Amino acid sequence: MNIYSVQAQIQRRAAALLHGKEQGQSSWEELDGRQLADDERGDRISLLLGGATGGVALSPASRAGLLAKAGTGTLFLTHIEKMAPAARRILYSIVAAKRYTPVGDPYPRPVNCRIIVATSRPLQVLARSFLLEWELVDTLGHIALRAESIIGALESEGLLNSHPSSLAAAS
């Protein structure tokens, strides 16, 4: 699902409402694409998303990638248009295959989390402007919602208190 708005705070609020974060439901992980603007080989995104299983010096918590930490919750990605092309290709391959393999682990694991992408404009507009690859846009889906509209709809008492996470399950 793509949430677009020019204000990051509004995007985060809309994503949190879709996730049901305020009710303390499933886990929530975030990744800011600006951190990966210089990840020319895609090494850092591989470790951030997939994590590493080996290594004695690392604590178990530091080895888990964002996908493992998110579990069946939500992975909230911001500024993916700012990621290096190699980092976006790795993101695409993980989302398209719906599985990932942590570093040092021979067995792939399924991606079970909901992925919400926050951008300043809809993904299709970014692809037409050559800021994103069409393959990634097609894989992330064609559901594009304006953040302000989500907040307006979900903050009405009856809808928000019913089942906010079921609304995002279709994403």
What are these regions (language model features)?
Residues 1-57, 71-74, 81-82, 143-156:
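Conserved post-Walker A coupling segment in P-loop NTPases
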Residues 70, 118:
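An anion/phosphate-binding loop that grips the pyrophosphate of nucleotide cofactors and donors
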Residues 69, 94, 135, 139:
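Conserved catalytic core of Hanks-type protein kinase domains
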Residues 5-14, 18-26, 104-114, 120-171:
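Nucleotide-binding/hydrolysis machinery
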Residues 55-67, 79-81, 86, 95-112, ...:
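Conserved Walker
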